[in-house]
Design a protein with these regions (language model features):
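Gly/Pro/Ser/Thr-rich low-complexity, intrinsically disordered segments predominantly at protein N-termini
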Residues: 1-182
Length: 182
């Protein structure tokens, strides 16, 4: 696919449905981004990220958790974080009846896990999340054994594998050891 190829929401849904082994996103300029399936370790860490978040939120009833196949539409971009949280009350009442539509909002909290992706590309994606309304983002960098925390105020903090991250005021009370997703 040429790097200049732009797609509409309907085209992106159609392309995704015809290619279930691939994941697609759309950049803010409308260009299509194709991501191959992850390897075993990356898929495992994505599943763990969602499971840790879901397990904690199920007992606190603060909102909904979404996995890496969910498309979030913020401005013109459509992105699919490895795990995401949307606070209660922010989703449209009928959100769970709209299977063939992207969620038309930015999550409150996202988790991304670096696989073989260039770290600069993922860091730019994290900044884009924040620019589009995400309040807190965690980027786990397995290659360098660290994590980065992105906040709505634009600050970014780097943490070592030995640190424990917390959901701050976005997912209040949620904590996770960095090493658990490395």
């Amino acid at each position: 696919v040429p790097s200049w190829w732009t797609v509409t929401d309907k085209e992106l849904i159609l392309i995704s449905s015809k290619n279930p082994d691939l994941q697609f996103e759309r950049n803010a300029d409308g260009t299509l981004v194709i991501m191959p399936p992850t390897g075993g370790i990356s898929g495992n860490r994505e599943a763990k990220a969602g499971a840790y978040l879901l397990s904690w939120l199920e007992s606190h009833d603060l909102g909904e958790v979404f996995g890496p196949s969910t498309g979030f539409k913020a401005n013109t971009a459509i992105k699919s974080p490895d795990a995401a949280f949307v606070a209660r009350g922010r989703l449209a009442e009928d959100w769970d009846e709209q299977e063939d539509r992207f969620l038309n909002l930015a999550p409150d909290f996202v988790i991304e896990i670096r696989s073989k992706t260039d770290i600069e590309t993922l860091q730019a994606k994290m900044r884009e999340y924040i620019d589009n309304g995400v309040r807190l983002g965690w980027l786990f960098d397995r290659q360098n054994q660290q994590a980065w925390v992105y906040r709505a105020d634009g600050s970014v903090t780097q943490y070592p594998a030995t640190a424990v991250l917390n959901g701050e005021d976005v997912v209040l009370g949620f904590t996770l050891a960095v090493r658990s997703l490395l």
